[in-house]
A protein has these predicted regions:
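FMN-binding flavodoxin-like domain, especially the glycine-rich phosphate-binding loop
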Residues: 1-3, 9-35, 40-143
Length: 143
């Protein structure tokens, strides 16, 4: 399994890590957040599994995350989609992520919307994902 995440404040990475490492403790992490690093292209085969996690800003996946996800291709590769939002609303972000990933050769097998501490208004969903969320995310991973 490959865990790919865009996580400027760390909440998205935390949710992705909980889910991904529960499914496959040997999963590799690919951080597409850092704009100063060379953004590599990745080609995953049908035997791989992709877990991709992105934050939601204003109900959308950040455009920079979409651009970076376009460098990852699959070949009918199973994908688990994770959107992380600050307890407001994730609007169409899950659909937007699904459309992007499937146009790159992946097949969505599961989706989840997770709550994490809001990236600007830290008082909303403060400290999340917390231990209760971790239990829920691990249960999701077992399905």
């Amino acid at each position: 399994m490959h865990i790919v995440y865009f996580s400027p404040t760390g909440g998205t990475r935390k949710a992705a890590y909980i889910i991904g490492k529960e499914i496959d403790p040997q999963a590799t992490e690919i951080d597409i957040t850092d704009h100063t690093r060379q953004q590599n292209s990745y080609d995953l085969n049908g035997e791989d599994t992709l877990l991709v996690a992105v934050p939601v800003y204003g109900g959308r996946v950040p455009s920079v995350a979409i651009d970076r996800l376009k460098r990852i291709t699959g070949h009918n590769t199973p994908a688990i989609l994770v959107v992380v939002y600050g307890n407001r609303d994730y609007d169409d972000a899950l659909l937007e992520l699904k459309t992007t990933i499937e146009s790159n050769g992946f097949q969505t097998v599961a989706c989840i919307a997770c709550i994490a501490e809001h990236s600007i208004m830290r008082v909303y969903a403060k400290g999340r994902p917390d231990s209760d969320d971790e239990t829920i995310l691990k249960n999701f991973s077992e399905q």
